[in-house]
Each structure stands twice: as structure tokens, then as C-alpha cells.
């Protein structure tokens, strides 16, 4: 703190401000005195008549410095020449008034006072040190009882509490043999008496001999605290203050308002209270007042100091005149409005402005339109200097007048100033780094900022009244960074997934799609052209329609690896309009790429291919040209929307009637009692969701084609030119789901609680809704809107937590040299390969050689997999690759470039200094908000899917079984009796094309290695029940299945057959709660096999019946799921990142071995695993849990025993960190994929790395750790390397998984943790330990106001460190090279303006 105050003294010696770390400790009384410039003796603030500060008061000029610059209070000394003189009359030093911001005062307290943070912030530090309970300490502090501080030779004990009665008794008995006190004095004495080293030794001896867990916990906590005090040179008695620092007056100002009133900071009230009580107490002590009065006054002093430090922490908060609690010192720094988040992490910026945005379709990608008025204001100082240097004005004042009058020459100067001076545009909320980009301003009339349409996706902007802010980078370095790193032309790829984000959308897509579509019998069909230009001329002269099919000779330029070009001319069949696109495509791209229908996906592919093959500059020019072309053609096409375009399919009526009939049938079955209410509901919902799909399909089929007359006069079918279809098919606007509601049927709607209303809306929007239908509609839609509001906040909070946990992760080295990595496989869901292996490993570094089936090395370890590598992997049918990952990177602080791989936003290997942590957090958090804002588009229409009950092959191929355990059924098919069975279908090369999870109890209709045709059924099962299957043949015998107590007889009305249904323990009479209903099978081999039956099982066999292998003994009904909505989504992502243990989570086998069941205790089953060495693991599992494994089965460690959501902590413990990483990555990806959002796995891995930072010590070995400590993984690794080098026992530890909030609070940096959450707790803990913040992360550096150690700041810090170590700091040139790794920014070499480049580009005709 001393240094912090010193840096404030004189800004002149700025060089001294460089520091490498900040320490926080308790302040000793001497320290507080040394900060102080005098004692505040009076509670007065300023004189009400003269408005001058009162002497010795809270604003005293003698203590804190002069009120006006270089002027003492009485006015004897004025002006600068007297600087440093102390006036003899009023005692004020003549200096700048700014010193009133950093000169502190102090108050000498008449009686010591405990610091409330160390008392009440849990765990209470004072309580821990004294080993007393908080209640007891409070009773002493607030003068309710005495505490014995020195028992002398009496029978009393130290730390014993005595109330008044006991105290007087003891006095009578022992006289002054003992000392007992009350109040903070007593606590201070006790703290002074603690001999820290002695206590530590005692505890170290006591800990190994402690049996009880709670005692052990308490002792190790106390030991940690004592060691913290010992190591930090803090004295325990400093937690009780005898001298109170006073904040500089300008930080708690008193401002005169009009009307003679004053506005004051609450702190002044709180200080006044303290001073009043302190002075009263001094007087009472001088008068030797009665004990009880003094005691009361001391208690009041303690309370007022408590309120000053942290109001409301104890008792009722002190309130001001307006009944609201006063803001204490602690409130000043915590929370969103506190010092950290309001002023240190979020500053307001000068040279900025904001205005509404409008579209600027004529701009180039690197430009934005800036209103003249705004530009003039923003660039004022620059304009002044230009006016002066050009001799148009002689003084600044004159220049100012000219600018105010807006004289004509001012505009010329402004244009000169603005040329090549980029500005930053920002749209709130800035959810990822593309929300702030640099543009070159173009001066425009009007008052709105013009924005280039292609960057709207990145800003998530639209033109319905959005506003944007403009900032001016002032220094040359800032301009350089803006131009080379932040220019919109350098941000073509999205950092989240590496795909182009500068991709045409909406109108542009519509225009491009329209001209690339072929129409039958269009004008000029069948013409053949010699050159592309000839065809373009024909289009221009209206002899050729853009939709006509033609043939044309096309000359392509092909570049090889070295960049040499060859030309190749071919005759191509194409559509006339596609030549317009070919005309703007850069040289070196293939004609085939634009010879397709230009849907949004294809345009994105085209842009991607252009970026990868032709580089940034070409891509930018191409994107602009595409946009101009798209806008023009969309206008010319005349595509618009009309009510006639919503064609209702003729089949709709029949389909709905058929569905109604089905529903009636089910209603009848329900009335006759064949189906339960739940089943009826499920089936009805099922029917309607199927019908809805059928109607939608009929509608789309109907919309998708037109019958037209071709040139021969015959009818021909062609893809439709219906406006709505065009918009949806091209991806310009609208989705099949929305068209379905316009022209199909609206379908099932959800209630606000997520359940589906079983009566669907049969009408669509074109037919119009009845009142009831409208009501049902709004019912679900309103939920969508309410959700949105809530979820936006949630998503923002998720992003904040993610940024906080990942902020200090930066690329610090090139290669850590680790051998480790993670195994990547294709991502499979519902049998389909959703994400090919190639796509998942693109941009990663290979960790182990990738081998072909012939054992050749295809990709050696250490190669970065690029697009070419992906082709190699796909062509060779490789189904797993080991790649380097951030999770296994060995760099202690940060990560290495090899483990991270490709920088997604730039498309080459990541640079050192890239802050990958923040990028990851933004990439995950940004779509969260997008998703929350997009729920209501489909209007609450329930997107429920019909339940699967069988699988059939999609492709022809060969069957492969995975983890299959089957029993042959009498009917000749196989019955699956394993839990995680999967069936794959491989092609001739051996590549798996599809893979399906098959549930327990399915009938499999094929054998391993069989060849199957596309569409052939492979397996089937009943989705609504879970069967219990016997693997053996034998005779079934009932055990504990008693009618009326554990089971009840259900009679099927149709067949008259009766079957038992097992009752849950809740529904049983009390005497049969502990019975365990089971079927015992006496097998033909003479063994007994027991099948326990869970509640609600419907038994399918009778007592004494002979059963065959594969038969079903009973079925357990399963409920079907509700709707899938991102509501499940966002909270799901948050749960995964917070590593929450799910409710009723899956139970996993703790070790491999054989299963048996012990005697059950009340409500729980005893589950036992015995491994090969005879070790036994027992656990109690609640009876209602359905255990998947039966007696005598073998299980592997980590296998699921009882179904449920997996618990990430179990996965980490039983299967290791890579299994955990795969689980979290897949789960998070599933949520985002459901919403069609693409995020690269790397980002999720980065967050997981941060969640795995801590380990728990299980055996301390020869280190200074304790068992149960939580330590940084990097530190333990370093410690172990040291220990092993010295041949000592290493530390044994277990990796810990921390949720992101916990991980943020557990960071090494207390500044970062304090600015995140729970500020008081973090600072209290840090101060006691005397923690040093090394300022490694980004956040800490922002708070202390330095350049961040990432990006260009990394070079600065490296240079600083070198200079500090006495090495020559390197020159500016090389520093800049390091900062902007030159290969990274292709446009850095191109400092000519884009316009020149552009003109040159167009002049070279294709």
C-alpha cells in the first residue's frame, strides 16, 4: 500500500511506477500512522458560512492539503512561487489541490476496536486463531461477558467466559490473582499472547493422532491460518485496530447543491459518528465515569467502526435520513457498482460518440459512413492542428472559432485528417471480439452512421433502430493495431468455428440464388457462347435471360503449389446468371465452385474456398463484389411475398381426417380401459406430431415443384420459382418450420410449463386461426417472450463466468514437447455421423503418427492437420486420430501453440500471445445469448419428435457389433443383454458410415459381419418399457411377490388375462416395506439366478412357468420426454461448466469385479463388487434406483450400474481427464448443435483445462503440503519434479474438477478473484495470507492499468522483463515484429489504400 501511495505523490518520476506484483497485507498501527498527515480530532466538515474546511475536522486543509491550487487557506500565500511553503498562520502547505485525493489522516481510538472483516467474514479469522466460537467472541467484543486473559494460579482457565455474576464471584474468591477483561482490548491481549511457532508445532504433533474427521478438518484449517500468519509477517493483534485511517477527502466529497444544501458521501456520516463517539469516550475516560457508561460508549464505538468498514454485516445497517442504509467502505469496492467493476474494469472512453446505424450498400468492406458533424467533434484536436499547420488559423482559439462556425476550409482539413485514420465501431452487447471492429471513415451527410451490410452478422446488428458507438484510436500505435489487427477486412473468419463470418445473407443470397437457378424454356435457352464476355453481353442486351440453360467456353486459371499459373479452357453447361458470379470470382478459383445453385450454404463454401486458396485480399474484394451483384439482382428479380404464394397442400384435409380417426380410436380404447391415461396422451401427441410432419412434407413437395411447358411444348417438372420457396430454399429468410405454420398446419403447442397440449392447431396462418386456436397459440408464445428476457440475463452471466475463469490463458510458448493428447473419433448421434473425424481434427496437431491400414505413416506426429490432411484422413477411412490438446499441455502458466493448433480466426498456426482463454469464453458465451433470443421465432410450436422403436440401415454395407452381449431367442433372432451395445455399418473400405446405440432387450435381426441393404431393418424394441430378460432357460419361481402387499393384480379387460404389477415401497402396507420382490430362476444347469423386480414392473410370466433364454420376465414402463428447447439448453451448459452433480445421477462401478448384493438396510440395497485380488467395495444404493446389473455379472471400472445423468466428478475419478473432456465436449456440443450453432471443440477444452487446474493432495510425501489441501496442478508438478530429483517421496494427488465460479474464485490472483464475486471474502483471505499477486492474467493488469500480457502487450512485458534483468531491451523494430508476427497479417504489408488495390484488381480483366 505504501508504494501505491508513493506513486500518487509525484507524477513526475513516472519511471518508478513500474512494478511486477502487488501484495496485500494487514496494516500495522505504525504503518497507518506513517500514511497519515495528521489526526482528525473533530467531526466538523466545513464552515456553513465561509464554506471553508474546519480545522482538525474531516476536511481540514492542514491535514489533507489546500482546497485551491497553490493557495493556503487564509490566503497569505498565493501562486506557484510559494510551492512547498507551510503557512504559519493556518498551517497549510502550498501545493496542488490534487493532494487531497491521496493524503490520508487518522483517528486515534480511545479503545481498540476489532476489524469486522476478520471477525465476521466466514470463516472468522479471529475465531480460528483463538479457537473460540464466533458467538463467544462477539459476547466479549460487545461487552456482554468477561474473558479470562491470564488465569494466574487460579482454577480458572484461559479463554474462559465469565458473565458479571461469575466475574464478581471470582474476584471475591481470588482477588487480583487473575486478569479478565471485556471488549476488543481483551481480544487484542489474547491475540498478542499467541505464540505462533509453538502453536504450529503442537498442531503438527496433534494432527496425525486425531481420529475424528471434524476435528481434523478444524485443526488443519487452524494450522493453515497460523502458517499464513507466520509466513506473511502479519501479527494477529493487527486484526484489532487501535488507530483508524481516514480516507482522503476528495474521495468522499462534499458538494454544494443549489439552494444552499449539500450532497455528501455516506462515508462522511459514518466517520462523523466514529469521531463523535471516540471523543465522548475520551472525555468519559478522563472524568473516570462509571464502568457501565464507559462500557456502553466503547460498544457504540465498536459498532460505529463496524458500520464504517462494512455496514450491515452485523446487526441492522445504519441508515441515513432517507431510511436507506449508508454505503460503507466495503460497499464502495464490491458489486457491479463497486470500484472494481465500475471504474477499474469498465471505464468510460473519451473521443467517442454514438448514433443510429443505417445500411451502406455502396460502401466497401473496410469502410463505414461517419456523419460529418460527428467526425468534426471526434477529430477536433486533429483538425485544430491541421488548421494551424496549414496557416489557416494563427492560434488555437481562432481555430476553435473556425470549427464552431463550420467554415468551408474546416471540412477540407477534416477530410485530410480522416484519410487513413481508422475508427472503431462497437455495438452493445459486445459478446465476442467481432463486436468491435475498425473501419476507415467516409464522411457523409445526415446524422446516422452507415454500416457495411456484410459485417452485420459479426455485430449481430440490424437496421431497426440499433445504435452503435464510434471510438477514435489516438496514438500511432493504436492506429497501427486498429489497421492491422482489427480492420473488418482482417476479420473474415469467425473465431468460434473458423468459418467465414463475412458471408452474404438475406437479400444478397436471394439475388445470387435467383440468378444461379435454371428455368425451363427461358429466353436464349440452348445458346452456345465462345467466351464468357459474349454471354454477359447477351444478358446485358436482354437477348439472354439469366435463368436460361446455355453452353459456354470457360477459361480457368489454375495455380499449383508454387504459385505458377496454367490456363485451361473447357466447354461448360451452365446457367447464364452463374456467369455473372464467375465474372467477379478471383483468378485461380474453379468454375465448378460457382456452377451450382447459390444457396447460403454454397455461398459460404465459396467464400471459405476463396479465403483458403486465394488469401485475404482477394476474398475481401470478392465479398464486396458478390454483395453488389446480389443486391442488384435481387432488385431485378422482383421476388416478393404474396398471400397466394402460401399454397396449402390439397392432401391436408385427408391427412387431418385420418389423424382424427386414429385419435378417436385411441379415445375408445382408453374408455374401455385398454390404455392408461398417460399412454393415451403419449399416443395422441405422437399421432399429431407425425401428421404435422406429413402435412409439412406434402406442403413442401407441393411448393417445391412447378409444372411448365418446355421448348418442345411438353409438360415438364422443374424446381419451383414460388417466392416463399425461393426465400427458404436459398437460406435467405424463413425456415421449413415457419412455412409449415404459414401453409401447413401450426401443429402442437406447448404450455408455459413445457408440456404439450394434446389438441393441435389444425389451421395455418393463411386460413386464419379461430379464437380458441389463437388463445392456445398465445399461451405458448408468451412463454417464449418471457423466457427470452430471463435467458438473456442468464447467458450474459454465463459469459462473464467463462471469461473470468479463462482470462489468464494465453499462448506463452511454441511447443511444450508433451507426448500426450486426446483421442478423436467422429461424432455420432442417432446412428448418423453428425461430424466427420476430418472436421473435428482440422487445425489440430497430430500427437501420434496416423497410420494407414497398410501401416504406412500418413501424418507424422507434430504435423498441423490442414485441409489437405483432412482429405488424407477421410480418404483412408481412418476412424480415430490422437491429437494434441490444451487439456494435456504441459506449460505451467498458459498453453503452447502446438497443443492449441490453428488460430481459427486467422487460419494459420496460433501466434504466441494470442489470448485463447477469452476467445474461448466469448465463442461459447456469444451463441448462448443468440440462442436465448431466438426461441420465439417458431412461436412456441412444440418441436417434439416421435419416439424411435427400431433402426434400419441407411447405407448398404457390413454389420459390425460393438460391446454386444446377446442371447439366442427361440424365434431365431438375438436378444441384447448388454448395456452399451452399438451396431455399426461399414463400407467396403472399412469406414463406418453409421453407428447406432441399441437399448437393452432389443431384438437384433442380423448377425455380426452380415451384409445389409439400404433400408433393411436391423433391430427393434419397445420404446415405452424397459424389459427384464433372462439369459438362461429354466423354471421361474416367485419370491416375495405377494398380492395386496408387494404386488397387485391387474386384469387386462380385452384378454381377461391377469398380471402382477409390483408396488413401490410407498404404496405398500408397513409390514411389507422391506420385502424384495424377485423372480428366482432354477436353471436347467441347476443354478439359481435371482432377478430383483423394481417398482411398477409388470410381470410377464407366472409362478412355476418354464422359460427359455431371451424371454421377457417383466417390463418396467418408461415415461416419455417433454419438448427439447434451449431452455434445457442454456441451464444445461451452465450445469456442465459449473460441474454440478446431477440429481439422481448415474451410479458407476468404483472398480472392476463381480457384482453381488448384500443384506439390504432400510430403503437401501447393499451393492458389492469383488475384484480378482479379493478386494471388496461396498456401497448403499437407494431401493428405488433401478440397478442395471444382476447378481454375478462382471462389471468394469467406470461402467454404469444404475441409469441416470452422468456425474462429471465420477467420470474424472474413474475414467480420467480425457474421458471427462470428451464427455463435457460432447454434451456441450449437443446443446449447441440442436440450435444449429457451430463451435470448435478447442474452445470447450480450454475451459475444461481451467476447471482442472486444482488437485487434492491424497498423500503429502516429502513436501510441505497437507493431506486434503487444494493446490494448483502446475505447482504440484513442479514440486514433484524437485522431489524426484532429490530421491524423495513425491506427492500423491487426485485431479479436482471445479465449476467455473469456484475455479474463478480459486485463482492465484486475488485481484482477479476479488473483482469477480465475493469481494470481501477474497480480500480478507488474501490479506491474512499476505498474498502476492504476480499480475499474470489479463484482468489483474487491466485493474492496475497496465498493458495486458497478451497480443502486442506480451512483447512489451517481455522487453520490460529483459530491461529489468539488465539485458538490453530490444529496439522498437524487433519489438514490433514480435508483436505483429508479420506473416499473420497479410494486409500489414499492403499499406496502400484499398481503393488503389481494388482499381488495379478490376483493371486486369478476366
Swiss-Prot record:
Gene Ontology molecular function: DNA binding; DNA-directed RNA polymerase activity; magnesium ion binding; zinc ion binding
Residue sites binding Mg(2+) per the record: 462, 464, 466
InterPro entries from the UniProt entry: DNA-dir_RpoC_beta_prime, DNA-dir_RpoC_beta_prime_bact, RNA_pol_asu, RNA_pol_N, RNA_pol_Rpb1_1, RNA_pol_Rpb1_3, RNA_pol_Rpb1_3_sf, RNA_pol_Rpb1_4
Co-factor requirement: Mg(2+); Zn(2+)
Cofactor binding description: Binds 1 Mg(2+) ion per subunit. Binds 2 Zn(2+) ions per subunit.
Pfam families reported for this sequence: RNA_pol_Rpb1_1, RNA_pol_Rpb1_2, RNA_pol_Rpb1_3, RNA_pol_Rpb1_4, RNA_pol_Rpb1_5
Catalysed transformations (reactions): RNA(n) + a ribonucleoside 5'-triphosphate = RNA(n+1) + diphosphate
Coiled coil: none
One GO CC annotation: DNA-directed RNA polymerase complex
Transmembrane segments: none
Residues at which Zn(2+) 1 binds: 72, 74, 87, 90
Residues binding Zn(2+) 2, per UniProt: 816, 889, 896, 899
EC number: 2.7.7.6
NCBIfam families cross-referenced by the UniProt entry: rpoC_TIGR (TIGR02386)
Assembly behavior: The RNAP catalytic core consists of 2 alpha, 1 beta, 1 beta' and 1 omega subunit. When a sigma factor is associated with the core the holoenzyme is formed, which can initiate transcription.
Entry's family note: Belongs to the RNA polymerase beta' chain family.
PANTHER family from the UniProt entry: DNA-DIRECTED RNA POLYMERASE (PTHR19376), DNA-DIRECTED RNA POLYMERASE SUBUNIT BETA (PTHR19376:SF54)
Record's protein name: DNA-directed RNA polymerase subunit beta'
Biological source species: Psychrobacter sp. (strain PRwf-1)
Lineage summary: Bacteria, Pseudomonadati, Pseudomonadota, Gammaproteobacteria, Moraxellales
Gene: rpoC
